[in-house]
Design a protein with these regions (language model features):
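N-terminal secretory signal peptides that target proteins for export/translocation
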Residues: 1-8
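Bacterial N-terminal signal peptides
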Residues: 13-23
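Cationic, glycine-rich low-complexity segments
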Residues: 34-157
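Membrane-engaging insertion elements
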Residues: 141-159, 228-267
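Conserved catalytic cores of phosphodiester-cleaving nucleases, focusing on short active-site segments
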Residues: 317-379, 385-389
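Domain-level recognition of nuclease-like catalytic cores that cleave nucleotide substrates
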Residues: 390-420
Length: 420
């Protein structure tokens, strides 16, 4: 993941692999261009430098996504795509904000109290689960079921460690999820420094009267996320569900929208998505009940074999649902030259992609030429093509794409939410 020269961008390779079939000859012989190098100061509107990071110049691309080099305390990290960059910079911002809590004496005292809490409770839970549960849980219901499952798993060795079980029983695990969502980050983030800081910060809730609200009240302005009303249900799902429950609910939703069991299992087992991101894919698909053959979208998402490809597919699902609900209703999904393409109910094809900066490279030319021919080969070809992307296109790319008869819509924003 580190070092531009030694890491070949995977997205371009993935599209090329899917589109080596039926590539028109003119796409292989025409003139191409090299994606332009860009100044991060211009791209990021002066935000190329900030506390804890520096986006290095120049920014390169592969014809689909921009490729960034970001300097942090951990070294230089290669980040592929505008979405991934926005995600990482926000994670760094939250990490620094949480770290600033150490300047508050009462918070530091809370951390010390949490660190001194005895571990006998956990040990007795594992060695005598029934006896301890009688002393710590009253009544029945979902929480009791969680505790029983967690203790049984710990005793059998099939679950998490005693420390993880303790976090669940004491409420620290839920506090961590609530804290993460309140500051606009994924509780299951892959960014290890932030994950460790969330653990440390949430641990204070086991000491005294500390709550997540008390913690967030100490954070600098602009960090707390005010979720839109329509996002409340998803927020509650992430906060209130244990990892096991979230996985079960996500899989159930995928099943309900027609995703085959093989694809369901493959997506749920894909290590390049977080648990929250898998849930986001499932619930975005559920929000498109009138669209046929959505399983093709899930199949492509399940095939992601790298983090950048996974985040690209996640953003594409979000963008497609947004298009369906705000631009034009979609009718069904067709596999065109190996890529799922949406057909609108009015007969127009919607090629909806979270591309950053489209340049007319050989791979881009092959990709779009094959898609153009594939659309024309459908039993009922579309009456037009709406090519909608989140970024922009070079002059050459715009000219060549327009020659296909496609209508180009650029700089279409990803809606505000947990996906950047």
């Amino acid at each position: 993941m580190f070092g531009f020269e030694t890491c070949r961008p995977k997205l371009a390779g993935a599209f090329l692999g899917a589109l080596l079939l039926s590539v028109p000859a003119n796409a292989l012989t025409e003139q191409y261009e090299t994606p332009p190098e860009q100044d991060p100061a211009t791209l990021l509107d002066g935000k190329e430098l900030g506390p804890g990071y520096a986006v290095l110049s120049p920014v390169r691309g592969d014809g689909f996504l921009r490729i960034y080099q970001v300097q942090t305390d951990l070294g230089v990290e290669q980040i592929e795509g505008d979405g991934m960059l926005k995600l990482r910079l926000h994670e760094i911002q939250v990490l620094i904000a949480l770290d600033s809590l150490k300047n508050d004496a009462s918070f530091v005292d809370g951390l010390k109290q949490a660190a001194m809490k005895p571990v006998e409770f956990v040990e007795s839970t594992v060695t005598d689960p029934v006896g301890t549960a009688k002393n710590t849980v009253s009544g029945v219901g979902r929480m009791f079921g969680r505790l029983t499952k967690g203790v049984e798993a710990a005793v059998s060795g099939k679950g998490g460690s005693p420390a993880e079980l303790a976090k669940s029983i004491t409420g620290q695990a839920k506090a961590r999820r609530e804290l993460a969502v309140d500051v606009g980050v994924d509780p299951y983030t892959f960014y290890r420094p932030l994950s460790e800081k969330l653990d440390e910060t949430a641990s204070v809730t086991t000491a005294g009267n500390w709550t997540v609200s008390a913690i967030t009240s100490l954070l600098p302005g602009g960090i707390i996320v005010n979720a839109a009303r329509q996002a409340d249900n998803f927020r509650n799902l992430i906060v209130d569900s244990t990892p096991t429950e979230l996985q079960e609910r996500t899989s159930s939703v995928l099943r309900a929208v027609g995703v085959p069991e093989v694809t369901n299992a493959k997506l749920m087992g894909n290590p390049f998505y977080t648990a929250s991101e898998k849930a986001a894919i499932a619930y975005q698909m559920q929000a498109m009940p009138g669209v046929k053959d959505l399983y093709l979208i899930a199949e492509k998402a399940a095939d992601a074999d790298s983090r950048d490809l996974a985040y690209f597919q996640l953003r594409r699902v979000v963008l497609m649902e947004t298009y369906n609900s705000t631009v034009s209703p979609l009718g069904d999904i067709k596999l065109v030259s190996g890529i799922p393409v949406a057909l609108r109910r009015d007969g127009i094809a919607a090629i909806v992609m979270p591309f950053d900066h489209v340049a007319w490279t050989q791979t881009v030319a092959q990709t779009f030429s094959a898609m153009h021919e594939g659309l024309g080969a459908l039993p009922f070809p579309p009456t037009g093509v709406d090519f909608l992307i989140t970024g922009d296109v070079t002059s050459m790319a715009a000219e060549r794409i327009a020659a296909f008869g496609w209508e180009i819509t650029g700089n279409y924003p990803i809606p505000k939410g947990p996906v950047f």
